A protein has these predicted regions:
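Generic start-of-chain signal for non-secretory N-termini
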Residues: 1-20, 27
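Long, highly charged, low-complexity intrinsically disordered interaction regions
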Residues: 4, 56, 62-80, 90, ...
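Short flexible coil/turn linkers enriched for glycine and charged/polar residues
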Residues: 15-16, 28-29, 95-96, 121, ...
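Short, ordered loop/turn segments at secondary-structure junctions
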Residues: 38-40, 129, 239, 321, ...
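Duplex nucleic acid-engaging cores and interfaces of nucleic-acid transaction enzymes
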Residues: 50-53, 60-318, 322-423, 430
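Structured, non-catalytic alpha/beta "coupling" segments that mediate domain-domain communication
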Residues: 74, 88, 99-102, 226-239, ...
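A glycine-rich phosphate-binding loop feature that marks nucleotide/adenosyl-phosphate handling sites
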Residues: 182-189, 319-323, 377-379, 402-409, ...
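Single-stranded RNA-binding regions, centering on S1/OB-family and related RNA-binding modules
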Residues: 543-717
């Protein structure tokens, strides 16, 4: 039997030794970001996505192994565990297969077969099921089991009981279930019909049928939701005449007097027990698969949203639009500190709009506002139009529509109250919107990732699994970027490798009590932050003020000695690194030979390359290499759009059937999957990601339905 490491190595296409090393590191308490970044030699430079896949599968396989032991123990307790059964359980590759093998031994609720066994009909059932050549005719065999005291009045009663027992035995056969399950998933079809006469968003599925292998995840989730709301009735179809021959081949033995009786028992087993059970299993498996796909897509969409390039160092105005309570306004400086707040009412009429423009213009001039961030919620359109009007008198100021999802939840929560105790709840959301433009990652980590809203059907998914996946993405992003130890909030620090909510708060408390951290080493004085946590977190925390320039890089303290040796070897010093005067470091290393230099300074080649990269750009932010967000000074109206126009936009969401693009008209346009590119793709994420800047051609505009159809593939380069 293969070990877990061997199974994972085969699935991931990695050497067994690398997989074993990763398992050992995980078991020692190392985090995925730490392993991905600082233990490359031990796993061949697997990326964080592969490592998370490995971790997920490791958990599944360990649960599978645990369940195998539980099942064997339970069967052994009944005195029925054989060598063959042990081998079958040990080689079962999925939890479903283990449960199939356990099924005959599982304590069941009272079934028709249980009642028949209580009437003493088990021997008759076994006699007929054996289908020996000398087996008597069923009617004759049944005579011996007539017993009115037990409720078996006639031979027909005895045969009915025997049939019930045989049907259950057939239904509990693991090989039969596996074969029919495979047939259903290959050849089955899912059908949904209207359960109501009223129109609804599920009208596409009012008369829908599709082969199971061809079903898209978004179709499964939509059908599930429609069924849950009582608007759809759903069935799984499988050609009975295709399934029964496979079942008969496994059970029926030709030439026996019991053959026809067993054929009938097969049909009863299929119709009454096997098919309803497999239909439930198929629906569950389809839902699980669709959920995993949707969670994966949510994670894929979340990552670029978190890694949006910051627009730092500029005074920014945040506008949280609204009707009843007006438009909330906050002005923050280049570090995110609040300078001013107010409320204006541009939607209350022309006079109030003029007053709002005058008030905001005065604020912009007073504080030297460079950028305006407008939330994309209620009244955003009117607020954007007012802003554009205002900017005609403010040259050099630009604006951007910011996704405000989760801002209201955050502003009303405990975290915002702790951060801004002196500000009204409504004004806190305006501060958050302004900060989202300045540093999206630092602000978005304060919000439950599910509330950011870049997925499909996220409320229908298993929430624990969704949380795990999304928190993993946030963790990967935070650690990939790195965190300033002296300015980061507890929310941001909490996602750093090796830290948790408690140690993150302790860092902030220590900083407030003792002043800025002079270097990384001082972290060891923080309560509850021991050597293991320090090992895991130190490399991801930056201290720009430190006397040691390496404290402002991604070089881990364990590699400081190697970095210093490398600098000496290349004739450079700390000051050269600080001044950015080591541009030719990689060339020097390559000229000397990477393997030779790595050996000389005592690290592996992957670590050497990372150290060189960090020394060449201390304090670098990987987000600065990504396309900058589009800042606008003017706005288009939907009525301005004409088919054939080519516009530049930002990808806001990527889902199974297409891509939503913000083209500056307040209503996102849809690029259907068929219009994403000229070649065939299974999913738009093969081509684009959230945050990408793309050129699109306007295909159609429906003002009544607020729909804009776009194409990427028809844009001529």
């Amino acid at each position: 039997m293969q070990s877990i490491a061997q199974i994972l190595a085969s699935e991931l296409g990695q050497p067994v030794q690398y997989v074993e090393n990763v398992i050992a590191l995980l078991d020692e308490g190392s985090t995925i970001p730490f392993i991905a970044r600082y233990r490359k030699e031990q796993h061949g430079s697997m990326d964080d996505t592969t490592l998370r896949k490995l971790e997920d599968r490791l958990q599944y396989l360990r649960n599978l192994d645990k369940r195998r032991q539980e099942v064997k123990s339970a069967i052994d307790g009944q005195g029925k565990l054989t060598e063959a059964l042990t081998a079958a359980i040990d080689s079962a590759a999925t939890l479903a297969e283990v449960e199939d093998l356990y099924r005959p031994y599982k304590q069941k609720r009272r079934t028709r077969a249980t009642v028949a066994r209580e009437k003493g009909l088990e021997p008759l059932a076994q006699l007929l099921l054996a289908q020996e050549k000398d087996c008597p005719a069923p009617e004759a065999a049944a005579q011996a089991y007539i017993d009115p005291e037990k409720g078996v009045e006639t031979a027909a009663d005895a045969l009915q009981g025997a049939n019930d027992i045989i049907a259950e035995i057939i239904s509990d056969d693991a090989d039969i279930r596996k074969a029919l399950r495979g047939l259903l998933m290959r050849q089955g079809r899912l059908r949904s019909l209207a359960a109501t006469e009223e129109d609804s968003v599920y009208r596409l599925y009012y008369d829908f049928e599709q082969a199971i292998p061809k079903l898209a995840g978004h179709q499964i989730l939509a059908i599930n939701r429609g069924e849950k709301e009582g608007l759809l009735s759903v069935t799984v179809l499988l050609d009975r005449e295709a399934a029964l021959p496979a079942l008969r081949r496994a059970v029926v033995k030709p030439g026996s007097a019991a053959m026809e009786f067993i054929k009938a028992a097969c049909e009863d087993a299929y119709d009454r027990l096997i098919y309803p059970s497999l239909e439930r299993e198929a629906r569950s498996a389809l839902t699980d698969s669709a959920n995993e796909g949707a969670i994966g897509q949510f994670a894929l969409n979340l990552k670029p949203l978190l890694l949006q390039p910051p627009v730092k160092g500029h005074v920014t105005m945040g506008l949280d639009p609204g009707y009843a309570h007006g438009c909330k306004v906050a002005v923050i400086d280049g570090t995110g500190k609040v300078l001013d707040t107010t409320v204006v009412y541009p939607t209350y009429g022309e006079r109030q709009k003029r007053e709002a423009i005058a008030k905001l213009t005065a604020l912009c001039k007073k504080h030297g506002v460079a950028h305006i961030a407008i939330g994309n919620g209620t009244a955003s359109r009117e607020t954007e139009q007012m802003t554009v009007e205002m900017l005609r008198g403010l040259p050099g100021v630009s604006y951007m529509i910011v996704n405000e999802a989760g801002a209201s939840v955050y502003s009303a929560g405990k975290l915002a109250a702790e951060e801004f105790p002196d500000y009204d709840v409504n004004l806190r959301s305006a501060i958050s919107i302004a900060r989202r433009l300045q540093d999206p990652l630092a602000e978005l980590v304060k919000i439950d990732p599910k509330a950011i809203g870049v997925g499909q059907y996220q409320h229908d998914m298993p929430q624990k699994r969704l949380d795990e996946a999304l928190c993993g993405v946030v963790e990967d992003c935070v650690n990939a970027v790195g965190v300033d130890l002296n300015t980061a909030s507890a929310s941001l620090l909490g996602y750093v490798s090796g830290l948790n909510g408690t140690t993150a708060k302790n860092i902030v408390a220590y900083r407030e009590a003792n002043g800025a951290f002079p270097d990384r080493k001082r972290l060891l004085k923080v309560p509850k932050l021991g050597p293991k946590a320090y090992e895991q977190c130190a490399g991801f925390l930056r201290v720009p003020e430190s006397k040691n320039v390496l404290d402002n890089t991604g070089v881990h303290p364990e590699s400081y000695g190697a970095a210093e040796k490398l600098l000496a070897l290349c004739g450079c010093g700390d000051e050269d690194v600080r001044r950015g005067a080591v541009d030719g470091l990689m060339r020097k290393v390559q000229a000397m030979g990477e393997a030779k230099v790595a050996e000389e300074i005592g690290v592996g080649v992957p670590t050497l390359r990372d150290v060189v990269k960090e020394l060449m750009k201390p304090g670098r932010d990987l987000r600065s290499d990504l396309p900058a967000p589009i800042l606008r000074t003017d706005v288009l109206d939907m009525k301005d759009l004409k088919p054939g126009m080519v516009l530049t936009g930002t990808v806001r969401n990527v889902i199974d059937f297409g891509v939503f693009v913000d083209i500056g008209v307040h209503q996102d346009g849809l690029v259907h999957i068929s219009q994403v590119c000229s070649r065939f793709i299974k999913h738009p994420s093969e081509v684009v990601a959230v945050g990408d800047i793309v050129k699109v051609l306007v295909l159609d505009v429906d003002e009544k339905k607020h729909r804009i159809s776009l194409s990427m593939k028809q844009v001529k380069e």
